[in-house]
A protein has these predicted regions:
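Viral structural modules
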Residues: 1-143
Length: 143
């Protein structure tokens, strides 16, 4: 009877964190768009563009991409839309981070509100969650 050995490669979570970030910006309605009477619908999605690692910390660079649908102030009360993004860059401390470790960042949009300042200007307020985790590769030999 022969003893068989197999190598197993697994990923283990070394460290993780949770950071909630408030984002706020005012946006102007472009001259080509009609005036805003009422915001009908808003939605957003977080996109992570880059994750840089340092000694026990990471920098997450990304943007909140939003889309808005609004009712215009025209006589026919037609609908119009606009979209854009809000950039962010956050520094997050993570214990036990080393150069060869893999960092994965899970994101979620917790809250987003759009308020009308005037017919040509809107305020967007959002709270996003960044949940980075550090994974390391482990190779084990099983008999």
């Amino acid at each position: 009877m022969e003893l068989m050995k197999k190598n197993i490669h697994t990923e283990r979570i070394k460290s993780k964190a949770l950071l909630q970030v408030p984002l706020e910006t005012d946006i102007n309605v472009s001259d080509a768009k009609p005036d805003v009477a009422k915001v009908i619908y808003d939605c957003g999605k977080i996109k992570v563009d880059e994750i840089k690692t340092g000694m026990n910390k990471i920098w997450v660079k990304g943007r909140l991409c939003y889309q808005l649908l609004y009712q215009t102030e025209s006589e026919d009360k037609s609908l119009a839309g606009m979209e854009g993004d809000i950039p962010f860059m956050e520094e997050i401390y993570l214990d036990k981070l080393e150069g060869q470790d893999r960092v994965i960042c899970k994101t979620s949009l917790d809250d987003m509100r759009v308020h009308i300042i005037n017919s040509r200007k809107l305020s967007i307020q959002a709270v996003i969650s960044l949940e980075p985790r550090v994974e390391e590769s482990i190779a084990e030999e099983l008999c």
